[in-house]
Amino acid sequence: MPTIQQLIRSERKRVYNKTKSPALKACPQRRGVCTRVYTTTPKKPNSALRKVARVRLTSGFEVTAYIPGIGHNLQEHSVVLIRGGRVKDLPGVRYHIIRGILDTAGVKDRAQSRSKYGVKRS
């Protein structure tokens, strides 16, 4: 604990917390346009072809976002909504695309966890 003299000499430093999703600019979601849709491979112990998209956001950032679920209809120039949330085994992917809104279709034949994949009750 600092002495009074130490506090007079230099004030307490304020601790700022750094955001994990800076491209959202403190908003819950952001709209963007896909500039590239492609697959990439995950980090070491895992093996797959993960579907990702490079998205140019309304905030001016260009980010890599993960496309969740089985199958998608995204292509270049698709308008998407993204949210925060990283993908642990894909370095540099810190955002998720929200399914079932704007140009992104919901997951076909999805029965469980439907709200997470933009599927209406059948």
UniProtKB/Swiss-Prot annotation:
- Record Gene3D superfamilies: Nucleic acid-binding proteins
| Name of this chain's protein | Small ribosomal subunit protein uS12c
The molecular function terms of the Gene Ontology recorded here are:
rRNA binding; structural constituent of ribosome
* Subunit comment: Part of the 30S ribosomal subunit.
Highest taxon in the source lineage: Eukaryota
Q: Which family does it belong to?
A: Belongs to the universal ribosomal protein uS12 family.
InterPro entries (UniProt xref): NA-bd_OB-fold, Ribosomal_uS12, Ribosomal_uS12_bac
User: Per the UniProt record, which residue ranges are transmembrane?
Assistant: none
